[in-house]
Swiss-Prot record:
Keywords: ATP-binding, DNA-binding, Endonuclease, Hydrolase, Nuclease, Nucleotide-binding, RNA-binding, rRNA-binding. Pfam families: MSSS, MutS_V, Smr. SMART domains: MUTSac (SM00534), MUTSd (SM00533), SMR (SM00463). HAMAP family: MutS2. It comes from the Bacteria. Endonuclease that is involved in the suppression of homologous recombination and thus may have a key role in the control of bacterial genetic diversity. ATP binds at G328, P329, N330, T331, G332, G333, K334, T335. It comes from Streptococcus uberis (strain ATCC BAA-854 / 0140J). This is Endonuclease MutS2. GO terms for biological process: mismatch repair; negative regulation of DNA recombination; rescue of stalled ribosome. The keyword Nuclease applies. Its EC number is 3.1.-.-, 3.6.4.-. The keyword Nuclease applies. GO terms for molecular function: ATP binding; ATP hydrolysis activity; ATP-dependent DNA damage sensor activity; endonuclease activity; mismatched DNA binding; ribosomal large subunit binding; rRNA binding.
């Protein structure tokens, strides 16, 4: 498709209307590169994708990809043996997560027949092991302690060093209080320092890091702290080195799969783009047009996509119709109709829904050419006519029988008689070479050309003679007429003058009267057609409502049958129980022989209906949702750490990837993380309580890491209350090591609480001093 037509018809602005519906960087990129195609099968597949996406939304009501950043540069860096940074790993982690979710979404689809989208969904690869490894990077772009034993050890040492350093500073602060400008610990050049009065600078031994602007205060790092700070500097350097090593290891894990991951990003972006097309279709009352294998265009109630309140029009450009000539005065909407046809074709050939009614049809052209507006080139010093004619010459040379040509005000800018003759000659050349053409003109001579020539049709834009305003309604088959006399009358020009003018143009008046009658007939036909369409739309709505009621009735009927079956079974089971009691009593009285009792019991049991639950769709779906599957995110109950299931060992045992560590877990040792459900529910302020495996009674876990003091204490208080209400026997409180402030506050709180029997740090393999286990009672 030639690029000039995309600029002339502002196709870029049309594409921009789809961007708000996109969620992924790859989807936005696909939209940016979108251009019209001239391949019938390709366009057909585009339309089938939208139709299939519609069936997905009908059955599931929601389908979301989620925000995915561009990972193409990260994939290139992997191929160049470069190591990725934390943000890049986080982006890939999100890609892996969404890939797994969409793959599971596809597997769970029911009552949906996909042909084209099936190929997209089934090409998405899932990598549960990689997903589990990247759990080492949390959503805050922070490398978790469990990423490696060495990192965990270093961070424990750093926390201990910070605690010792702070305590040491507090002691020094108290000891040298009389020498200080302020009783506080300051920071200079990343070092903890004391603000010492200049007059006492020699009383405090240490390294001077700064002096205040007034010179009255000297900031000294106490000598006792120098060695501690040097150790801290080394620990922080070791931490950075270990993080770099972990990033390198994670990059090496991803490198062999870089192309597959890039392909996943493209597939998800494409699904996102199809989803955006569907939402545009629904929100703009657009339609998926049929594709004509010949050049038969049929646009029903087509609208211009860039106008705020466009007037809908019908356009029938049959295969045997070569040229449509729109005649009539300016400002009636002729150019808009021309552009509407061009944009409908560009959108359709790009696989986009068009703003028209169902039943519309587009053709497939190799190229679309247009000469629209004043394209005068000042640099070339060309007149308006010369500029247009230069462009028209190019169009005539480049176009062929599989092109669509659009001319606005053909032949304008020169002597009217010569311009009209040129316009007719150009249209005749296009007609003879069977090039589909729509042209606008205000030359009356072209009306006769439209009537006298085969495969040519006149058209015009409706004008309201009462309001003296154009209606912008397209009138196909009716040539345009001048409304000058009628307008003059209504504006108050003397009737004698108007009649004299009419007598001077008797022939034209006769033609105008014929055209006026044609307009009336066309308007009457259009009203009848509009009424028929309204009835059709009502029938469609009625049909949909009936289907909906039928489905609801079927579902209600199934529920009633299920309920009746349950009640019947309960009655029979009750009767069976009572009968067994009677038989047992009779047996005790020896009134029946053992084999007679067995036979009687057998007959009674045969009365109980055996319910086939395998066909119960609700139970099947619920069971499927509850079952763990490869790729599911989990929380390990014993540690509260997040991981991903990468395989089923046997029975109820699963292999999980937690950071860089693999674990074998039973199903009661982890909980599934329902990411989709969490994303869809509105967020509420709640206590971060995660259920644990049942060890010596109910237990729960509260994570206070990263919380401020006041926030942590409020959550702890609410958590203990909730645990007591739920009869929890033990709870785990994760506070981390950090500065020790939260840990000490937790200890004080538990010591004071009358319902806390005892508490202690967790075992070393379950959190150590970073986690406190409290026994309640």
């Amino acid at each position: 498709m030639n690029q000039k037509i995309l600029e002339q018809l502002e196709f870029q602005k049309v594409k921009e209307q789809f961007q708000p519906y996109l969620q992924t960087a790859q989807g936005i990129q696909e939209l940016r590169l979108l251009e019209p195609s001239n391949h019938y099968d390709k366009i057909s597949d585009y339309f089938k994708e939208i139709a299939e996406m519609a069936t997905i939304f009908v059955e599931n009501h929601h389908f979301s990809i989620g925000n995915l950043r561009d990972v193409s540069e990260s994939m290139r860096r992997l191929e160049l043996e470069a190591d990725l940074n934390i943000q890049e790993l986080l982006d890939i982690k999100k890609l892996l997560l969404v890939s797994g979710e969409i793959s599971r979404f596809y597997q769970d689809l029911e009552n949906v027949d996909l042909q084209v989208l099936k190929r997209i969904f089934e090409k998405i690869e899932v990598f549960p092991q990689l997903q589990g490894s990247l759990q080492a990077v949390n959503d805050a772009a922070f490398i978790e302690n469990f990423a490696s034993p060495e990192l965990d050890r270093l961070r424990r040492q750093i926390a201990e060093n910070e605690r010792y350093s702070r305590q040491l500073l507090q002691d020094i602060l108290k000891k040298n209080a009389d020498y200080l400008s302020e009783s506080l610990i300051a920071s200079r050049n990343g070092k903890s320092v004391l603000p010492v009065k200049n007059t006492f600078r020699h009383r405090v031994s240490g390294v001077v890091h700064d002096i205040s602007a007034s010179g009255n205060t000297v900031y000294i790092e106490p000598r006792a702290l120098v060695q501690v700070n040097e150790e801290m500097t080394q620990l922080l350097a070791d931490e950075r080195h270990e993080i770099a090593r972990i990033l390198k290891e994670l990059s090496q894990l991803l490198r062999p799969h870089s192309r597959a991951l890039a392909n996943n990003a493209w597939l998800l972006g494409h699904l996102d783009f199809v989803r955006a097309k569907y939402h545009y279709l629904v929100n703009n009352k657009a339609t998926i047009p049929k594709i004509s294998k010949d050049k038969n265009i049929q646009l029903l109630n087509v609208r211009h996509p860039l106008l705020k309140n466009p007037v809908a029009n019908d356009l029938h450009f049959a295969d045997d119709l070569a040229v449509i000539v729109i005649t009539g005065p300016n400002t009636g909407g002729k150019t808009i109709m021309l552009k509407t046809l061009g944009l409908a074709q560009l959108m359709g050939q790009s696989g986009l829904p068009i703003l028209a009614d169902e039943g519309s049809k587009i053709a497939v052209f190799d190229a679309i050419y247009a000469d629209i507006g004043d394209e005068q080139s000042i640099e070339q010093s060309l007149s308006t006519f010369s500029s247009h004619m230069t462009h028209i010459v190019d169009i005539l040379e480049e176009s062929n029988s599989n092109s669509l040509v659009l001319f606005d005000e053909l032949g304008a800018g020169t002597d009217p008689q010569e311009g009209a003759s040129l316009a007719m000659a150009i249209l005749e050349q296009l007609r003879l070479t069977n090039i589909k053409t729509m042209a606008t003109t205000h030359y009356p001579e072209l009306k006769a050309y439209g009537i006298e020539s085969d495969y040519v049709e006149n058209a015009s834009m409706e004008f309201d003679s009462q309001s003296l305003k154009p209606t912008y309604r397209f009138m196909q088959g009716v040539p345009g007429r001048s409304n000058a006399f009628e307008i003059a009358r209504r504006l108050g020009l003397a009737e004698t003058i108007v009649k004299e003018a009419e007598q001077m143009t008797d022939t034209d008046s006769d033609v105008n009267r014929i055209i006026e009658e044609l307009e009336r007939q066309t308007l009457s036909s259009r009203r009848r057609l509009d009424h028929i369409r309204e009835v059709e739309q009502e029938n469609i709505k009625f049909n949909r409502a009936v289907k909906k009621l039928y489905n609801e009735f079927s579902l209600a009927k199934d529920k009633e049958i299920e309920k009746a079956s349950q009640e019947a079974q309960a009655i029979v089971e009750l009767a069976l129980t009572e009968s067994e009691e009677i038989l047992s009593k009779l047996h005790e009285k020896a009134e029946l022989k053992p084999h007679e009792i067995i036979e009687a019991k057998s007959k009674l049991k045969s009365l109980v209906p055996q319910r086939d639950l395998s066909k119960n769709k609700v139970l099947k779906k619920a069971k499927k949702l509850r079952e763990p599957r490869i790729g599911d995110d989990i929380i390990v109950s014993a540690y509260g750490q997040r991981g991903t299931l990468i395989g089923q060992v046997k029975g109820n045992k699963w292999e999980a990837q937690v950071g860089l560590i693999k674990m074998t877990l039973k199903e009661d040792e982890f909980q599934l993380v329902k990411v989709e459900a969490e994303a869809q529910k509105p967020k509420k302020q709640s206590i971060n309580m995660v259920k644990k495996a049942n060890q010596n009674g109910p237990r729960a876990r509260l994570d206070l890491r990263g919380k401020r003091y006041e926030e942590a204490m409020q959550e702890l208080d609410a958590f203990i209350d909730q645990a007591l209400v739920n009869n929890m026997s033990q709870v785990d409180i994760i506070h981390g090591i950090g500065t020790g402030v939260i840990r000490e506050a937790v200890t004080k709180y538990l010591r004071r609480h009358k319902h806390v029997k005892s508490f202690a740090y967790a075992p070393q393999n379950a959190g150590g001093s970073g986690c406190t286990i409290a026994t309640l009672g």
